[in-house]
A protein has these predicted regions:
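Mg2+-dependent phosphoryl-transfer enzymes with acidic/Ser/Thr/Gly-rich catalytic loops
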Residues: 1-4, 21, 191-276
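Non-catalytic pre-domain segments flanking phosphatase-related domains
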Residues: 1-9, 26-29, 33, 212
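Active-site metal-binding loops of divalent metal-dependent hydrolases
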Residues: 9, 43, 222-223
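Active-site phosphate-binding/coordination module
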Residues: 22-125
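Short, structured coil segments at secondary-structure junctions
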Residues: 62, 70, 176-178, 232-233, ...
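Conserved acidic, metal-coordinating active-site core of Asp-based
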Residues: 99-220
Length: 276
């Protein structure tokens, strides 16, 4: 019997306007009545995730958890300090940062465990994309030495052409990404986490902590950085606007897009039939 549904945020649980469709809210409230946990799982920081969910009825997240930084951290809802956290070595982040400076036209986000997000070479278009759901601090120059003793969780490159980001990934010196898990998201991000850290590892860690069989979990997503979670869960569901690579490894592609509210189909196809 399904006990937990984990979902990506952007372009999956949230519509393209970064709002939660009412259909998702109604479906989650019914899921909670049936005893199923709702767990947001995002590449974003915990605080950014909670800000996007601030208008949800409290019952949606009561007693639940949040997987952030692509599995790098797990928080209890309402607690800023993570109960599970991975750390990315400063030297690795600095190496990637220096390469971004060398390239010249690549932007970068650097995420601290405390939830601060530092941006380098950020365009106005990127600021507009992030407006209302992520607060970005702009780096003061071409150095991140001031972050040397700050616990870091992940970083990513920003470029608004995913094909060119894929080309960049293929042509980069392998030493730059040694010891890292990499993925792509939102049509604009090339993401870096410590090896073994992804949304799938985060879901497995949370399920184990809660004593839930991974087969009794459902994951929802739309893009490459969701694929490990889609494969780890008992059922992997993608929205109709999912990328082809995510669709290919999913168990079920919903008719609903992120703007419609995919949780209605999750509820009707997988959860309610077990309670009849």
């Amino acid at each position: 019997m399904y006990q937990l549904v984990a979902t990506d945020m952007d372009e999956t649980f949230l519509g393209h306007d970064h709002a939660v469709p009412q259909a998702n809210i109604d479906a989650i409230l019914r899921m909670r009545e049936l005893g199923v946990l709702f767990v947001p799982a995002s590449g974003r920081a915990y605080g950014s995730i909670m800000n996007s969910l601030r208008n949800l009825p409290p019952a949606c997240l009561e007693g639940s958890y949040v997987i952030s930084y692509n599995g790098g951290c797990i928080n209890r809802v309402g607690e800023d300090k993570p109960i599970i956290a991975s750390r990315m070595p400063f030297e690795v982040v600095e190496r990637l940062f220096n390469h971004a400076v060398f390239l010249g036209d690549i932007g970068m986000h650097i995420y601290t465990q405390a939830g601060d997000i530092w941006g380098y070479n950020i365009t106005q278009s990127e600021l507009d994309y992030l407006a209302g759901h992520m607060d970005l601090k702009i780096l003061p120059g071409d150095s991140i030495e001031f972050l040397r003793d700050v616990p870091l969780s992940k970083c990513l490159y920003v470029y608004e052409n995913l094909d060119l980001l894929h080309e960049l990934a293929l042509t980069m010196d392998p030493a730059l990404t040694e010891g890292l898990s990499t993925t792509f998201s939102s049509g604009r991000y090339y993401e870096f986490n410590p090896t073994g850290v992804d949304k799938g590892s985060g879901l497995r860690a949370l399920a184990e902590m809660l004593g839930i069989d991974i087969a009794d979990t459902i994951a929802c997503g739309d893009s490459a950085n969701d694929m490990a979670m889609l494969e780890a869960a008992g059922v992997g569901v993608v929205v109709s606007n999912a990328t082809p690579d995510a669709v290919a490894i999913s168990d079920y592609q919903a008719k609903a897009s992120c703007d419609d509210g995919v949780f209605v189909e999750v509820l009707e196809h997988f959860i309610e039939p077990e309670h009849r």
